[in-house]
């Protein structure tokens, strides 16, 4: 008789190979057809909500792995919260205004000079919407679930209107003002930039020491003395109006070979070295404090202009001479200190960074080219003491990667000073996963300057400001709200399509416009004001959402970006942060921790991962990272991830195959009647569930990744599933022992599938559709397993048994190497007490030891001859006695000898009798 036909072998249609690139789109189509996002919301309607507010990615270009990391973690969070019973809507968003889209159109050959502003803006809008569709498709392919049919988009009329109203509220509170201040200016973009749009790169610059003759000594210094300043921006010397010294620092007048120089005493050695002075030739003639030098007058080296000596606390002794070249038109500190002394603000550059007529002999020169002309002129005037070149970290435009300058221009500002303390207080009220996140945003708010919110571009939300005939600014509640209403009805393009008077309320008058003539502001708002208004435009405007959000989660660059602009506008208008909890992730690097770049050939993109391996591999990779810091990806890392995935899949498949004839409605064994080993596994499952839920709650996905592997490898593969084959395949179908194990296997399968569902969204769904008798149509509409108290005494007992079992396995391995046995079923294990452990007494508590050890025979006695000493007893491995049963392959001395039951052990004889 062929006994193979009498075995209850695993049966399942669940394929061994994932085939994810082909399978996943089919699963996603089903979700779409079944309207799963809405069903998930409906299921938890009326429950406590959990709002993760999506920081809008920029609507330009293909997705990179940073996008994938961000969106996948957000999806894991929202799916988990949904399965925990929260009403957790997810509204994805896109940021659509700004220079990159203007540049993209220019690259495509669109000439904005050949069309009206409104026409060009319409093309920008079309381009942005096309980009959104491409990115949307790619996000959905990653398995991200959300309201992609109705995302929030910063160019939508209702969003722009909300932004204008928020602006109006800030204006009402006196937080919006116009001023001429030095701001970061990008000649390459021809626009001002906010701090968030600046990045630092190394730049080679001229480093010069310049002498300024004393003009009026004020009775403090000698008439023939000179102040020495140091600068790395020679082109700003034409704008110099002052020399700043620190009031509390000690300064000295030094005689060097007959020349008299004034510098800070603390820097005298550094200056002497830089200017190659002979140390023996240096004499300190006079000493004074910076306060005593205040109002001394110096002469500009080549212009007929006084350079006033003033006091400023920003002067340090870190570098230079302690006498700081001061040009209020080209530096924030210079501007602030200059205001105290009513100094002129000179900034003789145009939008392209070229000197204007005000620049005199430098007119028409690009500022960087003027460096040489200025140093040549200083040499000619005998004012240049030293010229070197240094490489230093310098601010660059984050879009064009070109250097920026400080340039004083009329700009619109949002006041940070007036709300700074309120924002800092709101940060104190916000929860963070890591302390450094709090410190980072706190310090940025504490140290940041006023926020330049105007941009000299056309693709953006216009500033709702009008001017009267006499130049008065018109920015009232009435006018701003009227503009908001117009934008809501027509979109912001109406600003560029209508005259100013047609954008004002009907019949509007102003004393500054006796003729009824008005003009409008042509600057647009900083894109950070756009996205920073999303709490108003989205959280407060959409019925399914609410303010403040439970979570903002973005890349760590957003501490100075979206996190920063959002809390600024929210505190300014609502008096609180827009988020209760702030979480960030690092950047994605290559396998060696290097930045990805085409030139290095180390770029991996989401599209490639999804097409070659599947979205679930990308998602599993995300869960395997310590995302709070920078993370790594490479082909090798993805291969390792695929191996882990394969192990998970095969384990789930094995369990599916072995519950194919199990019906939980009729076959389940009550917990009290389960075999103790099955109760042990049930409690290990509960332990695993509790820690996994805790890790989800704490956003610790790496811990989940590690614990899943540990549970699968240690508890299931290395023990329970291996041990179980002798029961699941061999025992009679309805045997108590078999149904007991199936009861627990079914529970493990269902609970593990749920616990994996937020991460392996497609695979969990595929397992669910192959799991018999599940009630929900989708695992994503099921609830997470409940955390149940474990039987700790039972776990302690079995944990000790598992440690003893490890010793038995070590002994079996030795016996295998010594050719005593081949397979473990050829073994007889003899165990006894030793000084370490009373194994005989301990093992009396357990039944079916031969099955638990996966051997044919076990003998337990107080003492064992010729045994090896192990931590948990003395162990000897013999070859099993008797003959091998042809059905279960266990060795026995009681093989059947007649007819159908020949060569079977007593157990198999009983089972086969029921089948014959």
From Swiss-Prot:
Main location, first listed in the record: cytoplasm
GO cellular component: cytosol
UniProt entry tagged with the keyword Ligase: yes
Placement of sequence motif 'KMSKS' region: 595-599
InterPro entries according to UniProt: aa-tRNA-synth_I_CS, aa-tRNA-synth_Ia, Anticodon_Ile_BEm, Ile-tRNA-ligase, Ile-tRNA-ligase_type1, Ile-tRNA_ligase, M/V/L/I-tRNA-synth_anticd-bd, Rossmann-like_a/b/a_fold
Gene Ontology biological process terms, A to Z: isoleucyl-tRNA aminoacylation
PROSITE patterns referenced in this protein's UniProt entry, alphabetically: AA_TRNA_LIGASE_I (PS00178)
Record-listed ATP binding positions: 598
One Pfam short name: tRNA-synt_1
Family matches, as PANTHER family: ISOLEUCINE--TRNA LIGASE, MITOCHONDRIAL (PTHR42765:SF1), SOLEUCYL-TRNA SYNTHETASE (PTHR42765)
Protein name: Isoleucine--tRNA ligase
Organism: Staphylococcus haemolyticus (strain JCSC1435)
């Amino acid at each position: 008789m062929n006994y193979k036909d009498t075995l209850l072998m695993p049966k399942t249609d669940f394929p061994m190979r994932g085939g994810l690139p082909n399978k996943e789109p089919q699963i996603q189509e089903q979700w779409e057809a079944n309207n799963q996002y809405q069903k998930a919301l409906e299921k938890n309607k009326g429950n406590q909500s959990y709002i993760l507010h999506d920081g809008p990615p920029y609507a330009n270009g293909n997705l990179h792995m940073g996008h994938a990391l961000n969106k996948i973690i957000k999806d894991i969070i929202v799916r988990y919260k949904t399965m925990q019973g929260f009403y957790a809507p997810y509204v994805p968003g896109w940021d659509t205004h700004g220079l990159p889209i203007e540049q993209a159109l220019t690259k495509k050959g669109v000439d904005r000079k050949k069309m009206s502003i409104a026409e060009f803006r319409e093309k920008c809008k079309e381009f942005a919407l096309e980009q959104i569709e491409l990115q949307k498709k790619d996000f959905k392919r990653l398995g991200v679930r959300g309201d992609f049919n109705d995302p929030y988009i910063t160019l939508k009329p209702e969003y722009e209107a909300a932004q204008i109203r928020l602006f109006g509220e800030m204006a009402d509170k006196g937080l919006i003002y116009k001023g001429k201040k030095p701001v970061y200016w990008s000649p390459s973009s021809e626009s001002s930039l906010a701090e968030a749009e600046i990045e630092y790169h190394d730049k080679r610059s001229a480093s010069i020491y310049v002498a300024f003759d004393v003009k009026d000594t004020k009775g403090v210094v000698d008439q023939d003395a000179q102040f020495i300043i140091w600068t790395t921006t020679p082109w700003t010397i034409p704008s110099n109006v002052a020399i700043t010294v620190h009031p509390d620092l000690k300064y000295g007048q030094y005689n060097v070979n007959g020349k008299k120089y004034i510098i800070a005493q603390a820097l005298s050695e550094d200056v002497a070295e830089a200017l190659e002075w002979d140390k023996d030739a240096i004499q300190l003639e006079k000493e004074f404090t910076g306060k005593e030098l205040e109002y001394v007058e110096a002469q500009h080296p080549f212009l007929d202009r006084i350079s006033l000596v003033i006091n400023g606390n920003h002067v340090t002794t870190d570098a230079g001479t302690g006498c700081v070249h001061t040009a209020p038109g080209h530096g924030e500190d210079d501007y602030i200190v200059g205001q105290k002394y009513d100094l002129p603000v000179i900034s003789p550059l145009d939008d392209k960074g070229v000197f204007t007529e005000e620049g005199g002999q430098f007119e028409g020169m690009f500022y960087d080219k003027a460096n040489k002309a200025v140093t040549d002129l200083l040499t000619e005037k005998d004012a240049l003491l030293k010229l070197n070149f240094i490489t230093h970290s310098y601010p660059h435009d984050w879009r064009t990667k070109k250097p920026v300058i400080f340039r004083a221009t009329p700009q619109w500002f949002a006041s940070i000073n007036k709300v700074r303390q309120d924002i800092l207080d709101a940060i104190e009220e916000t929860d963070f996963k890591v302390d450094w996140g709090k410190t980072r945003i706190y310090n940025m708010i504490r140290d940041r300057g006023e926020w330049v919110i105007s941009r000299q571009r056309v693709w953006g939300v216009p500033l709702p400001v009008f001017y009267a005939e006499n130049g008065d600014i018109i920015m009232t509640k009435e006018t701003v709200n009227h503009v908001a209403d117009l934008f809501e009805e027509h979109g912001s393009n109406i600003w560029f399509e209508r005259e100013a008077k047609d954008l004002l309320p009907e019949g509007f008058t102003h004393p500054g416009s006796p003729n009824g003539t008005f003009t409008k502001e042509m600057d647009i708002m900083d894109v950070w004001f756009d996205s920073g208004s999303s709490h108003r435009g989205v959280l407060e405007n959409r019925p399914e959402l609410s303010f403040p959000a439970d979570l903002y989660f973005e890349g760590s660059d957003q501490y100075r970006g979206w996190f920063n602009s959002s809390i600024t506008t929210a505190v300014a208008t609502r008096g609180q942060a827009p988020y209760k909890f702030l979480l960030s992730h690092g950047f994605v690097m290559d396998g060696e921790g290097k930045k990805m770049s085409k030139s290095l050939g180390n770029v991996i993109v989401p599209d490639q991962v999804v097409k070659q391996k599947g979205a679930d591999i990308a998602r599993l990779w995300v869960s395997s990272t310590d995302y709070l810091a920078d993370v790594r990806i490479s082909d090798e890392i993805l291969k390792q991830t695929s191996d882990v995935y394969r192990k998970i899949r095969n384990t789930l498949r094995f369990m599916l195959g072995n519950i194919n004839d199990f019906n939980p409605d009729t076959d389940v064994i009550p917990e009290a009647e389960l075999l103790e080993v099955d109760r042990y596994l049930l409690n290990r499952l509960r332990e695993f569930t509790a820690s996994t839920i805790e890790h989800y709650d704490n956003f610790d996905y790496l811990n989940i990744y590690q614990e899943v592997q540990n549970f699968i490898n240690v508890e299931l593969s290395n023990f329970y599933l291996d041990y179980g084959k002798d029961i699941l395949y061999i025992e009679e179908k309805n045997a108590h022992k078999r149904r007991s194990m199936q009861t627990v296997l079914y529970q493990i399968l269902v609970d593990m599938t749920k616990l994996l569902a937020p991460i392996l969204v497609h695979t969990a769904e595929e397992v669910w559709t192959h799991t018999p008798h599940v009630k929900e149509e989708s695992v994503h509409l099921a609830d997470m397993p409940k955390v149940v108290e474990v039987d700790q005494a039972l776990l302690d007992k079995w944990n000790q048994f598992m440690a003893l079992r490890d010793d038995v396995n070590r002994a079996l391995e030795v016996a295998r190497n010594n050719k005593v046995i081949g397979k473990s079923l050829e073994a007889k294990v003899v165990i006894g007490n030793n000084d370490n452990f009373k194994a005989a007494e301990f093992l009396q508590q357990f039944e079916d030891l031969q099955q638990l050890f996966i051997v044919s025979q076990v003998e337990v006695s107080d003492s064992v001859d010729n045994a090896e000493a192990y931590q948990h007893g003395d162990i000897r491995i013999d070859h099993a006695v008797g003959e091998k049963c042809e059905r279960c392959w266990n060795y026995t001395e009681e093989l059947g000898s007649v007819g159908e039951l020949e060569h079977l052990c007593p157990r198999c004889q009983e089972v086969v009798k029921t089948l014959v």
